[in-house]
Amino acid sequence: MYINETYAKKWAPVLDHPELPAISDPYKRAVTALVLENQERALQEEARSMQNLWEASPANAMGSTSPNGLAGAAGAPVAGFDPVLIGLVRRALPNLMAYDICGVQPMTGPTGLIFAMRSQYASNTAMTGEALYNEANTHYAGAAGANPLATLNANIANVTLANTGTGMTTAVAEDKTLEYMGFQIDRVAVTAKSRGLQAAYTLELAQDLKAIHGLDAETELTNILSTEILAEINREVVRTIYATANIGIVGLSTAQFNLSSSADTSGRWQVEKYKSLLFAVERAANKIAKDTRRGKGNMLIVSTDVASALSMTGLLDYNSALTNNTNLMVDDTGNTFAGLLFGRIKVFVDPYSVAGTDYAVVGYKGATPYDAGLFYCPYVPLQMVRAVDPTTYQPKVGFKTRYGLVANPFATAAGLGALANDTNYYYRRFQVLNINQ
């Protein structure tokens, strides 16, 4: 994402609003500023469309400058349209769980592209295999061994001088045709998808709600619709990670960790078995490092009972969730940050996990927004539409949002960024059985 400092300065009054939690992360500020800019552009286009429909506004039109609307200050970022939308974007966007469990790449248009470059072993006519990923093929640029190490998966038991490539002798080098290498560019298309909700209310309801409770019906419905849309996007991100994560701790055959099985754990006390669960998490994190060559797993999504089991081991530092609460961006919809495991793995509790079905999902997310297995790509977060029923003359309100969701091109073997079950190398999931025994 290209970070435009002009947007950050333009939206500074909104980003630094004193009544809202501060956005300390520079990238979150940049993403929020860009999405606010997209929101403003969408509202301006909507206003121009309305002007094309009517030569003059009717006398009873309700807009941002009407007595029933809210007006932005002249010259301010929200001038000329309802700031309720801007406020919702400012509150909602930084609290998305996606910032912590996947990458966030805002879109500036309805479609976008993600490019990835792969180094390749090649012939003079075609690519033959990816390079600079797993262990280097020692015979490729030198003299071939009898059984190249590349076919042995670096199994130390099978490594001998006979199957390790060496440099070429002068006689061989003077006459040998050198091997080819090259690169290919993978292109992944991201297309914005939409979500929308609507609500209707009567003028009588609005009048009574205002008179008795002092509440504005449109504002309350706006909050309900926007909160529901945000909650649905959050759950889509979480469930997509669950579905696309590779299965198992090491390999696809170990999809379960059984605390009552001697094959998985052995301990006299329950807390000793829980420490075996920690080792299972470490093995999954190590497997992610081998598959991605980016880093060990540093993020963990667990069910409630698994989080409690981890805390019983004494290695889940939940104090960080209290002392640094202002920086953790705990999701308002219920997904909570539990603390740090081993001082480096962020642990998130999924409050919607079904009782009796315990699991853990280990994932990796790098320091930059480009280093993740899944990308959430917001385009227009909230677009509000007001209407009046032509028969009853009762008001209606609707919301639509547009965003994309795509896998990292390097996250799957195909490299196409497709969201497919059990294929994403950046995440691994396994079920935890008999946690109460």
Where are these regions (language model features)?
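Sequence/fold signature of self-assembling virion shell proteins
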Residues: 82-83, 92, 98-100, 171-232, ...
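Acidic/histidine-rich catalytic neighborhood
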Residues: 248-273
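Acidic/polar, low-complexity extended loops/arms that serve as protein-protein interfaces
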Residues: 70-78, 89-98, 107-236
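Extended assembly-interface regions of large multimeric machines
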Residues: 1-139
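Short, intrinsically disordered N-terminal pre-domain segments
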Residues: 1-22, 244-245, 257, 316-330, ...
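Short, glycine/acidic-rich hinge or "gate" loops at secondary-structure transitions
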Residues: 217-218, 233-256
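Short linear, low-complexity motifs centered on an aromatic residue
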Residues: 123-142, 243-247, 410-426
